[in-house]
């Protein structure tokens, strides 16, 4: 399909994402990319450790992870996400959308863009939900 006749702009979107990613990675350089990866890892593991301190919430202690992990919640993940959204936090992915038996499981991703204070606020809001 020629771009002029295409009914979708998927090719343009893919091109723009590829270009933005290339620019970002080239600006970071080899050492910068490693630093970003280490930040992702450290922040995600900090978040997981803090989540484990909230009553009723648990990150699988034996499953290794980089910057995404599954959290077992004491209530359905959809309710957790509603509570988080009420506090201006976009929660994790509700695994029950793909696996109905995982109703209380939430997939959380932490990146270099998340500050420590944002992670701490997230933990505080989770703690409020577990107190209710």
Residue ranges and their predicted role:
Residues 15-17, 23-30, 74-77, 96-98, ...:
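Short, glycine-/Ser/Thr-/acidic-enriched flexible segments
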Residues 97-132:
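PLP-dependent enzyme catalytic core of the Aspartate aminotransferase-like
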Residues 46-54, 79-89, 125-129:
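Generic non-transmembrane alpha-helical segments
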Residues 1-55, 59-62:
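Active-site C-terminal subdomain of aminotransferase-like
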Residues 56-87:
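Conserved PLP-binding catalytic core of the aspartate aminotransferase-like
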Residues 62-64, 86-107:
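Conserved PLP cofactor-binding pocket of PLP-dependent enzymes
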């Amino acid at each position: 399909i020629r771009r002029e006749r295409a009914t979708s702009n998927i090719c343009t979107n893919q091109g723009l994402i590829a270009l933005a990613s290339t620019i970002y990675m080239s600006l970071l350089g080899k050492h910068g990319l490693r630093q970003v990866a280490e930040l992702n890892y450290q922040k995600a593991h900090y978040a997981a450790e803090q989540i484990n301190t909230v009553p009723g919430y648990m990150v699988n202690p034996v499953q290794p992870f980089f910057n995404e992990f599954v959290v077992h919640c004491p209530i359905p993940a959809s309710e957790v996400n509603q509570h988080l959204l009420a506090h201006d936090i976009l929660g994790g992915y509700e695994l029950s959308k793909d696996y109905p038996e995982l109703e209380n499981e939430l997939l959380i991703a932490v990146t270099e863009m998340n500050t420590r204070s944002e992670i701490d606020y997230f933990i505080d809001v989770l703690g409020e939900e577990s107190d209710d």
